[in-house]
C-alpha cells in the first residue's frame, strides 16, 4: 500500500521537529560551576565558592528528591568528627615504633573543618551549632596483652604532639568505669583492659550541615538546585566547558547544562560519572563497594548512660571502616547508641543505587588492577565473606564484648550507607587498594571528582580547599582569595602541631562559636572535666 504524505502535514511535522529542537536547546543553560551530588562534599565546595566568588553562577544536580540522603545522611555514617583521637589505624607500628604522622595530618585537617564551621556559624549560614556538632569524648578501648602494649606505646608517642595533649591513659577498671560505666557493668574484674580517653572529641551530623548549607545557598540569586535529576551523559564542548545532560526522574523531562567547571561529589557514583566524562585520569581507577550495618538502641535507660565514641581495634585484614565502636549519637533530635559497623556486601555503589554498578564501572583499564588487588588483599576478601555470613547471634556477641549486659530486645539492626574503596592502577603491583579519599582532576582543571571513603565528611572543608588549589591554582594564589581564605581559616598555611600558641587560640575560638561545652584547652588537660550525665541529651 502506498502512503502519501501531504505537503501541509509534512511542513507541520518539520515545524514541530524544529520547535522541539529549539525547546531542547533552550533547556541547555550555562553556569560557571556545576556540582553533581547533593551531599556534604558538593555543598561544602559550593559554600567555599560562594565565599570566594559570590558572583559565580552555580547549579547542583541531585538524583534523589532531597539533599543529604545518601552517605551524608546521619543514619548512613558513624558521625565521628575524625581527629585520630581514637582510631588506631591512623597510628601504625613500624619496626617497633609508632608512626603518628597520619594521625597528626588527620587532626590538623579537622581543625580546618572546625574553623570553617565556626565561620559559617558567624555568617549565619549555619544555625544552632548543637543541631550538628556536640562534644562527645573519644576513647580507644582494647584488651589482650599485645593490644594493651600497642595502645600504651601509641599514647606515649602522641604525647609529643600538642594536638593530643588532652588524651589520658588508664588500665584501671575503676577509672574506666567512671568514664564508660555501661561498658564495665558485668565485665570480668580480672580482664586486662587499656583505654585512652579524650574529652574533646565530637559527634557530627553531616546531613544537618549539608541541609543548612544548601538551604542558605538557595537564598542566593546565582544558585539553582535540581532534585530528582539523574546525570545521563557528560561530554566536552569545543570551548573546553562541560555539557551535562540529566533526566528528571519524576516526570521524565530532560535538560542539560554547560559548565566552565564540573565537580563530581556523588559518593559511590563519582567513579562511574568520572569514567563517563572520558578523561584519561579516571581510567586508572576502579572501585570495590563495601556496605555497613549497625546495631542501634534508642532505649533512654541505656542511651543516657553512655557518653563516648569507644573505638576498638580492627580485625586482621579488615578495612578501616570496619573498626568496631560503641557510639553515642544524636539523630533526629534523639540520643542513641550505635554499635558496629558490620561489613555488608552489595554490588551497588550507592545505598539507593543499582546492582549493576560494579559491573558497569569495570573496564579494560581497571579490570586487571582490581583482580591483582583481590589476590593480594585476600585477608580482606576473607574478612568480608566472614562478615556477610554472620548471624544475628554473632553480631550480638560482638556487641557484648563492649557492652556485656546488652539485651537483644533493646537493639535493632540498621543498614547504613555504601562506601566504594578505591583501587588504583600501579605499574609495579598491577593495582593497589587506596584507603582514604582521593581527588581526581583533569589536566586542565576543568573537572574534578572525589573518590574514596574514610575520613570523608570530617575533612570536607580541607579537601574542598585542596580541590580549589588543584583547579583554580592562580585564583588561590591571588591576594583576594588568600585574604578571604585566611579570614575563614585563621590557621591557613600554618601547622598547628608546630605552633601550640596558635592551636590554643583556635581551640578557644572554635569552642566558643560552636558551643562545644565544656570549653577545653588542648594544652591544659587538667582544665578538662568529664562530660556530665546530661551530655548531649540536654540540648
UniProtKB/Swiss-Prot annotation:
Any one biological process term the GO annotation gives: tricarboxylic acid cycle
Catalytic activity: (S)-malate + a quinone = a quinol + oxaloacetate
Region (Disordered): 516-539
Keywords per UniProt: FAD, Flavoprotein, Oxidoreductase, Tricarboxylic acid cycle
One MF term in the entry's GO annotations: 2-hydroxyglutarate dehydrogenase activity
Domain of life of the source: Bacteria
Pathway given in the UniProt record: Carbohydrate metabolism; tricarboxylic acid cycle; oxaloacetate from (S)-malate (quinone route): step 1/1
Cofactor: FAD
Pfam families registered for this protein in UniProt: Mqo
E.C. number: 1.1.5.4
InterPro entries: FAD/NAD-bd_sf (IPR036188), MQO (IPR006231)
Family annotation (HAMAP family): MQO
NCBIfam families: mal_quin_oxido, PRK05257.1-1, PRK05257.1-4, PRK05257.2-1, PRK05257.3-2, PRK13339.1
Family to which this protein belongs: Belongs to the MQO family.
Protein name per Swiss-Prot or TrEMBL: Probable malate:quinone oxidoreductase 3
Organism of derivation: Pseudomonas putida (strain ATCC 47054 / DSM 6125 / CFBP 8728 / NCIMB 11950 / KT2440)
Amino acid at each position: 500500500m502506498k502512503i502519501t504524505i501531504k505537503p501541509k502535514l509534512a511542513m507541520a511535522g518539520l515545524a514541530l521537529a524544529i520547535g522541539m529542537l529549539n525547546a531542547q536547546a533552550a533547556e541547555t543553560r550555562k553556569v560557571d560551576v556545576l556540582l553533581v551530588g547533593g551531599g556534604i562534599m558538593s555543598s561544602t565546595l559550593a559554600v567555599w565558592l560562594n565565599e570566594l566568588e559570590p558572583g559565580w553562577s552555580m547549579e547542583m544536580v541531585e538524583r534523589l528528591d532531597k539533599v543529604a540522603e545518601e552517605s551524608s545522611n546521619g543514619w548512613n555514617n558513624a558521625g565521628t568528627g575524625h581527629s585520630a583521637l581514637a582510631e588506631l589505624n591512623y597510628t601504625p607500628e613500624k619496626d617497633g615504633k609508632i608512626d603518628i604522622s597520619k594521625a597528626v595530618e588527620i587532626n590538623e585537617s579537622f581543625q580546618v573543618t572546625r574553623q570553617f564551621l565556626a565561620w559559617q556559624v558567624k555568617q549565619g549560614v549555619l544555625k544552632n551549632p548543637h543541631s550538628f556538632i556536640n562534644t562527645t569524648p573519644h576513647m580507644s578501648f582494647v584488651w589482650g596483652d599485645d593490644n594493651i602494649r600497642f595502645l600504651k606505646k601509641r599514647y606515649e608517642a602522641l604525647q609529643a604532639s600538642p594536638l593530643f595533649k588532652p588524651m589520658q591513659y588508664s588500665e584501671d577498671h575503676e577509672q574506666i568505669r567512671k568514664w564508660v560505666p555501661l561498658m564495665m557493668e558485668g565485665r570480668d574484674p580480672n580482664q586486662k583492659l587499656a583505654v585512652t580517653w579524650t574529652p574533646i572529641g565530637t559527634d557530627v551530623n553531616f546531613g544537618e550541615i549539608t541541609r543548612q548549607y544548601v538551604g542558605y545557598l538557595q537564598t542566593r540569586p546565582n544558585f539553582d538546585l535540581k532534585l530528582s535529576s539523574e546525570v545521563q551523559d557528560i561530554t566536552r564542548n569545543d570551548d573546553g566547558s562541560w555539557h551535562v545532560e540529566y533526566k528528571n526522574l519524576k516526570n521524565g523531562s530532560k535538560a542539560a547544562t554547560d559548565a566552565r567547571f564540573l565537580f563530581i561529589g556523588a559518593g559511590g557514583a563519582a567513579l562511574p560519572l568520572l569514567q563517563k566524562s572520558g578523561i584519561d585520569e579516571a581510567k586508572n581507577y576502579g572501585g570495590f563497594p563495601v556496605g555497613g550495618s549497625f546495631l542501634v538502641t534508642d532505649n533512654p535507660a541505656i542511651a543516657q548512660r553512655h557518653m563516648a565514641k569507644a573505638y576498638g581495634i580492627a580485625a586482621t585484614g579488615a578495612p578501616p571502616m570496619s573498626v568496631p565502636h560503641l557510639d553515642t549519637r544524636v539523630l533526629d533530635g534523639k540520643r542513641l547508641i550505635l554499635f558496629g559497623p558490620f561489613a555488608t556486601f552489595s554490588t551497588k555503589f550507592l545505598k539507593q543505587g543499582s546492582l549493576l554498578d560494579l559491573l558497569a564501572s569495570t573496564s579494560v583499564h581497571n579490570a586487571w588492577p582490581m583482580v591483582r588487588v583481590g589476590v593480594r588483599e585476600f585477608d580482606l576478601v576473607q574478612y568480608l565473606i566472614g562478615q556477610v555470613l554472620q548471624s544475628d547471634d554473632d553480631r550480638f556477641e560482638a556487641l557484648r564484648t563492649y557492652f556485656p549486659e546488652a539485651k537483644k530486645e533493646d537493639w535493632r539492626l540498621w543498614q547504613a550507607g555504601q562506601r566504594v574503596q578505591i583501587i588504583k592502577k600501579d605499574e609495579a603491583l598491577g593495582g593497589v587498594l587506596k584507603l582514604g579519599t582521593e581527588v581526581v582532576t583533569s589536566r586542565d582543571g576543568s573537572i574534578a571528582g572525589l573518590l574514596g571513603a574514610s575520613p570523608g565528611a570530617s575533612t570536607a572543608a580541607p579537601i574542598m580547599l585542596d580541590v580549589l588549589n588543584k583547579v583554580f591554582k592562580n585564583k588561590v594564589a591571588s591576594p583576594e582569595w588568600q585574604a578571604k581564605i585566611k579570614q575563614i581559616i585563621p590557621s591557613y598555611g600554618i601547622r598547628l602541631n608546630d605552633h601550640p600558641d596558635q592551636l590554643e587560640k583556635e581551640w578557644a575560638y572554635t569552642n566558643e562559636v560552636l558551643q562545644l561545652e565544656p570549653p577545653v584547652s588542648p594544652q591544659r588537660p587538667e582544665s578538662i572535666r568529664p562530660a556530665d550525665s546530661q551530655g548531649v541529651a540536654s540540648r
